[in-house]
Amino acid sequence: MIPFALKALFANKLKTILIYLSLIFSIISIFLISSISNGIISMYSSMLKSDGDIIITQSNISDTFFSNVNINLIQKINKIPDVIESSALIVGASPVEKLPIVAIYGASQNRFKNYKLELGNYPKQNEVIVGKSIYEQLTNKNEIQIANKSFKISGVFKSEIGFENGGVVLPITYAAEIFNKSASMIMVNTNLNSNLESVIKEIKKLDTQIDAKT
């Protein structure tokens, strides 16, 4: 049976090549997505130091990359005593030009200030900002496509979180449409010397499907 299978493969060389290419691309994609996931873990530790006292994700999931949290919780979270501000982020991945997998971040408007612009302006309707390392690799430095949607490049940023410099940031509403999720995570800033455990307890009362960590 094996000789017949080998004969069939050699008889159709184009089909065989396509199968090999498909396998290679799948393996590369797995490694790249794994790399992005590891980058997200690194990003978490940086966020907890400089970008939020509490991070909220979906509970009982195998990988934070697949987290989906209701962004509308922000309105309720902001009413909890000692909470100063909450922001949301969607994390995804997509091919961009010749790059097979690029990290895509959908950010709520109040998160844009976390990205230090080196060129241009923060994104508005149908616009994105790109990390410095990605920008240098783009052939078209005016526009990019994400999931068959075209976006104008409004600016270039440099983030203190090194992994983000290799990504693309766009308004969270567009990312929600592309990745079919509300928010990957919500970051909560609290007053100095606030009781974080008490705040977390109140946050968890809002939704049984979320997890909150300091």
Where are these regions (language model features)?
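Short, solvent-exposed hinge/capping segments at secondary-structure junctions
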Residues: 109-115, 130-142
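Short aromatic/hydrophobic contact patches that present stacked aromatics
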Residues: 55, 127-129, 185-187
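Hydrophobic, regular-secondary-structure patches
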Residues: 28-102, 201-205, 210-211
